[in-house]
Design a protein with these regions (language model features):
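Short catalytic micro-motifs in class I SAM-dependent methyltransferases
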Residues: 112-116
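Conserved class I S-adenosyl-L-methionine
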Residues: 1-40, 154
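Class I SAM-dependent methyltransferase SAM/SAH-binding core
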Residues: 47, 53-98
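C-terminal alpha-helical "lid/dimerization" subdomain adjacent to the S-adenosyl-L-methionine
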Residues: 138-191
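A short glycine-rich, Lys/Arg-flanked "PGG" loop and its adjoining helix->strand segment in the class I
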Residues: 123-135
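A conserved beta-strand element that flanks and buttresses the S-adenosyl-L-methionine
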Residues: 109
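Nucleotide donor/acceptor-binding cores
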Residues: 43-44
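C-terminal lobe and adjacent flexible extensions of AdoMet/dcAdoMet transferase-like proteins
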Residues: 194-199
Length: 199
């Protein structure tokens, strides 16, 4: 992982999977749980926040084969790799702090990206996600969290300059404030998948 003059960090798409699986042994279980949490929603349009190399999108599209996916990531290099896996997807350079792509979506998904925002940033993002979801749509958030038991912290993180995980309870509260009916669908140590349905 390298930082650029703007203070952003970028992963090497060639080595990202090896890095994340070495630091996060439950990575593939998290990915499977993320895809599972998207089931049960009639889905034609998907928005992914933090596409990375396309690992999550590929799994979600396997569940929703006829859906169209729009995705953002701040790394053009990661998106180049993702486009090879997802040639039909509309992938764009963009940050979580920026305006989300226009339109109404049935499903919004984010895996291992939102923990880079602080608490206020997460709460504000959840409000903007709710605005993009149709009634009956779902937001699936899979991420690094602060566990109740500190001994469950297994994923290496920095001093808060880039990694800013939050407690599950706080994220459920922010999601509820944004209008979601939110619940935890999977959890393992310092990882969790949360599904929020928009009434």
């Amino acid at each position: 992982m390298d930082d650029d003059p703007a203070g952003q960090y970028h992963f090497d798409p060639e080595t990202y999977l090896d890095l994340v699986t070495s630091e996060m042994p439950a990575y593939f279980a998290l990915q499977e749980a993320t895809a599972e949490a998207t089931t049960g929603v009639d889905t034609a349009r998907i928005l992914e926040l933090g596409v990375g190399t396309g690992e999550t999108a590929e799994r979600v599209l396997a569940v929703h084969a006829v859906a169209r996916l729009t995705g953002i990531d701040e790394s053009a290099e990661m998106l180049d790799r993702a486009r090879k896996r997802l040639p039909q997807a509309d992938l764009r350079v963009g940050r979580l702090e920026d305006a989300l792509p226009e339109g109404t979506y049935d499903l919004v998904v984010s895996a291992l990206a939102v923990h880079h925002l602080d608490g206020d940033g997460k709460a504000e993002l959840f409000m903007r996600v709710a605005e993009r979801l149709r009634p009956g749509g779902r937001f699936v958030l899979a991420d690094l969290v602060i566990p109740d038991d500190a001994s469950d912290t297994t994923t290496p993180i920095d001093d808060g300059a880039y990694d800013k995980p939050s407690r599950v309870e706080d994220q459920l509260r922010w999601l509820q404030a944004a209008g979601f009916l939110a619940r935890v669908t999977w959890a393992h140590r310092d990882l969790a998948v949360i599904a929020g349905d928009r009434p």
